[in-house]
Curated annotation (Swiss-Prot):
GO terms for molecular function: DNA binding; serine-type endopeptidase activity. Homodimer. It catalyses: Hydrolysis of Ala-|-Gly bond in repressor LexA. Represses a number of genes involved in the response to DNA damage (SOS response), including recA and lexA. In the presence of single-stranded DNA, RecA interacts with LexA causing an autocatalytic cleavage which disrupts the DNA-binding part of LexA, leading to derepression of the SOS regulon and eventually DNA repair. CDD domains: S24_LexA-like. Residues 28-48 bind DNA. It comes from Aeromonas salmonicida (strain A449). Belongs to the peptidase S24 family. This is LexA repressor. Keywords: Autocatalytic cleavage, DNA damage, DNA repair, DNA replication, DNA-binding, Hydrolase, Repressor, SOS response, Transcription, Transcription regulation.
Length: 207
């Protein structure tokens, strides 16, 4: 794709957002109104420029005749949330090779805003409704407080547990009375907090 001007990028982003939220592209008048153009004709000129660069196709005869030509996956990558698969030791959790797919889920549905999804494995957090196969929405941060549910990496394992720390001692607490807490001594073990759990997308098999 040829480089876009800042204004063209704004128009393209508006088209993507409108299609994501409503299922339809915006009209020329809507583009003009939302981006502050003086007229729908100004919006039309930007659309023609995007078409010339191979980003969209203009369909004649309809006010919403705009079709995205960029790959659907590219749209998902920009508007959805990545699903993280198996994580290699020593690699950033959001490294491209860890991303299995993208889900068309609005990150702003969660507070704080979600940065990625992680598929839950096992029933260690079942007492608070986080079940095997669920998708856990995660806000990427290393700043967490005692009592919060976190995504932590210990050696090569990524786990979801409730966080508790006192000095150099950390306990990763399950929400399942059949399992024992994981004790971590930060003076001799490396623990990485990958993020804070901010929501759950239920596995349909449980419903």
């Amino acid at each position: 794709m040829k480089p876009l001007t800042p204004r063209q990028a704004e128009v393209l982003e508006l088209i993507k957002v409108n299609m994501s939220e409503t299922g339809m592209p915006p009209t020329r008048a809507e583009i003009a109104q939302k981006l502050g153009f003086k007229s729908a004709n100004a919006a039309e000129e930007h659309l023609k420029a995007l078409a010339k660069k191979g980003v969209i196709e203009i369909m004649p005869g309809t006010s919403r005749g705009i079709r995205l030509l960029i790959e659907e996956e590219a749209v998902l990558e920009e508007t959805g949330l990545p699903l993280i698969g198996k994580v290699a030791a020593g690699e950033p959790i959001l490294a491209q090779e860890h991303i299995e797919s993208h889900y068309q889920v609005d990150p702003a549905l969660f507070h704080p805003r979600a940065d990625f999804l992680l598929r839950v494995q096992g029933m260690s957090m079942k007492n608070i409704g986080i079940l095997d196969g669920d998708l856990l929405a995660v806000h990427k941060t290393q700043e967490v407080r005692n009592g919060q549910v976190v995504v932590a990496r210990l050696d090569e394992d990524v786990t979801v547990k409730r966080f508790q720390r006192k000095g150099s001692q950390v306990w990763l607490l399950p929400e399942n009375e059949e399992l024992e807490p994981i004790a971590v001594d930060l003076s001799c073990q490396q623990l990485t907090i990958e993020g804070l759990a901010v929501g759950v997308i239920r596995n349909a098999d449980w419903m």
